Amino acid sequence: MIKKTRVAFLFDKRNNWISNFIKRDKFKRYNKKFSFNFFENKNKVKKFDIVFILGFTKILNKKFLQQNKLCLVIHESKLPLGRGFAPVQWQILKNKNKITVCLISINEKIDQGDIILKSIITFRGDELSDEIRFKQATASILLIKKFLKKFPHYILTKQKGKSTFYRRRNKFD
């Protein structure tokens, strides 16, 4: 029997909007090659081959990153522009209707990992929160599936150019 690649999805308990989309999809097409696990507690995520960290609002430390072979995150901006928090919301507030979605490796610095894959979300400008989240989830799932299809043959591309940073949003934004 061929050993399956162990995949974990880590969600933030307080920001787990994407977990329902991911769990609903189930990635059945990939079950022969991968085993999938879902977590909201980072302390339970150890010794995985791939960890997708989605909607997570906390910074993960070096110890966590070293416990797993490959940690990945989806970030919705044209990196290195727009590193940081709530990039979709900040860009919508700036009237951007095409937003880049990146699958990146994680290192110890916020959103500074190498880019693996990219796609684009297009907005009309009149979407409500649920529709925005649906488009984000759809783009994220497509990037994850594209990555899984290519794995272990993927290319890391360094981020280039001037960087900008989005601060955390608060109740006054």
What would you call each of these model-derived segments?
Residues M1-D173:
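One-carbon transfer enzymes
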